[in-house]
């Protein structure tokens, strides 16, 4: 993800002499204290989100419908209350973002259609190889597949499937709300957009370590394999979190990251090993390479802020005195 780094990694200066003390950058707090408040607020949100999954005592596995329903209740409550954490952070730091709280968190109408479509299209391009693999391995042809996808009965079955609702709706919506929409506005004034893109996913990645508890409880594998799997999942979710954080900043919308998260949950991690042993290996690997190449080529054009209107986080940094944030142009 080289496109996310570079000059975006510089720290936001908080001691420019031309800025008045009451600047919107850090309010009434010094830079060090403001950053500690921001990091502590993000850590509190992450702990609250993961902790809410374990308030219900149960001996049942995580995929049991009863467990899923209880956890729906928990994470929906935590996610609904998470904007209050941002509101409290704003009061403690004295930062004035220049927009409403909901707008700052990506809930706005300006540019909503390109924000919903273009990031999803970009992500599907990245998954060109896995999509080709899925198509090759599917026993039905394209016309039959579309009939199944568009059939109301198929959607009715999905909406009554607790695991589908968790993976495609509740998890993407609540995780993006908490780990992107709430955390990025708190981290950006402290460290700048570039470092925030890479710091925010660390909370997201660590939050997925709770799966170790489930696997150890039910002895789903050896201890070594469980921790190896957890380390891999942390790496994968951290990279994915950086990508959706990048999308959130560049579009100023929450809907794009949510849809991309849902799509990636459906696709899973690309089955590269299976592709290497596939009967149609050469065209499939060419599809993988083409997808990655087109993704890198289109990453900047399809996330150009000019397509999405005024970006709330960029407005916040402009008020903080940083009018040249690289990710804002």
Swiss-Prot record:
Enzyme Commission no: 3.4.26.1
GO biological process: CAAX-box protein processing; MAPK cascade; protein prenylation
Lipid bilayer topology: Multi-pass membrane protein
Sites annotated Transition state stabilizer: 261, 265
Compartments where located: Endoplasmic reticulum membrane
Residues spanning the membrane: 25-45, 75-95, 112-132, 186-206, 229-249, 254-274, 283-303
Catalytic activity line of the entry: Hydrolyzes the peptide bond -P2-(S-farnesyl or geranylgeranyl)C-P1'-P2'-P3'-COOH where P1' and P2' are amino acids with aliphatic sidechains and P3' is any C-terminal residue
InterPro entries: Rce1, Rce1/LyrA-like_dom
Tissues where the protein occurs: Ubiquitous.
PTM-bearing positions, type N-acetylalanine: 2
Annotated GO MF terms: cysteine-type endopeptidase activity; endopeptidase activity; exopeptidase activity; metalloendopeptidase activity
Regulation of protein activity: Deubiquitination by USP17L2/USP17 negatively regulates the proteolytic activity toward Ras GTPases.
Enzyme class: hydrolase
Catalytic residues identified in the record: 175 (proton donor/acceptor), 208 (proton donor/acceptor)
GO (cellular component) term, any one: membrane
Entry superkingdom: Eukaryota
Keywords: Acetylation, Endoplasmic reticulum, Hydrolase, Membrane, Protease, Transmembrane, Transmembrane helix, Ubl conjugation
Modifications made to the protein after synthesis: Ubiquitinated. Undergoes 'Lys-48'- and 'Lys-63'-linked ubiquitination. 'Lys-48' ubiquitination induces its degradation. Deubiquitinated by USP17L2/USP17 that cleaves 'Lys-63'-linked ubiquitin chains.
Functional summary from the UniProt entry: Protease involved in the processing of a variety of prenylated proteins containing the C-terminal CAAX motif, where C is a cysteine modified with an isoprenoid lipid, A is an aliphatic amino acid and X is any C-terminal amino acid. Proteolytically removes the C-terminal three residues of farnesylated and geranylated proteins, leaving the prenylated cysteine as the new C-terminus. Is able to process K-Ras, N-Ras, H-Ras, RAP1B and G-gamma-1.
UniProt family annotation: Belongs to the peptidase U48 family.
Record protein name field: CAAX prenyl protease 2
């Amino acid at each position: 993800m080289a496109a996310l780094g570079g000059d975006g990694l510089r720290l936001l200066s908080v001691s420019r002499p031309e800025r008045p003390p009451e600047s919107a950058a850090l309010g009434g707090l010094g830079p060090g204290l403001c950053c500690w408040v921001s990091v502590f607020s993000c850590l509190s949100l992450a702990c609250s989100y993961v902790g809410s999954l374990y308030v219900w005592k149960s001996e049942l596995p995580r995929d049991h419908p009863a467990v899923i329903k209880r956890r729906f209740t928990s994470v929906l409550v935590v996610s609904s209350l998470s904007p209050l954490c941002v509101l409290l952070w704003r009061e403690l730091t004295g930062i004035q973002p220049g927009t409403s709280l909901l707008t700052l968190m990506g809930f706005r109408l300006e540019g909503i259609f390109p924000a919903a479509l273009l990031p999803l299209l970009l992500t599907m391009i990245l998954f060109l190889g896995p999509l080709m693999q899925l198509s090759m391995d599917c026993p039905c042809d394209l016309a039959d597949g579309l009939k199944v996808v568009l059939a109301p009965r198929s959607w009715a079955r999905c909406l009554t499937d607790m695991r589908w609702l968790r993976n495609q709706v509740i998890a993407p919506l609540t995780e993006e709300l908490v780990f992107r929409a709430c955390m990025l506005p708190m981290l950006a004034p402290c460290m700048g957009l570039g470092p925030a893109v890479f710091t925010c996913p660390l909370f997201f990645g660590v939050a997925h370590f709770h799966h170790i508890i489930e696997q150890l409880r039910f002895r789903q594998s050896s201890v070594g394999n469980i921790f190896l799997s957890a380390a891999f999942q942390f790496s994968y979710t951290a990279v994915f979190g950086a990508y959706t954080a990048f999308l959130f900043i560049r579009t100023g919308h929450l809907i794009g990251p949510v849809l991309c998260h849902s799509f990636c949950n459906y696709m899973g991690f690309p089955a590269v090993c299976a592709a290497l042993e596939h009967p149609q290996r050469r065209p499939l690997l060419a599809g993988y390479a083409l997808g990655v190449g087109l993704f890198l080529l289109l990453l900047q054009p399809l996330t150009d802020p000019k397509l999405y209107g005024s970006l709330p986080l960029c407005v916040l940094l402009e008020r903080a005195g940083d009018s040249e944030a690289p990710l804002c142009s």
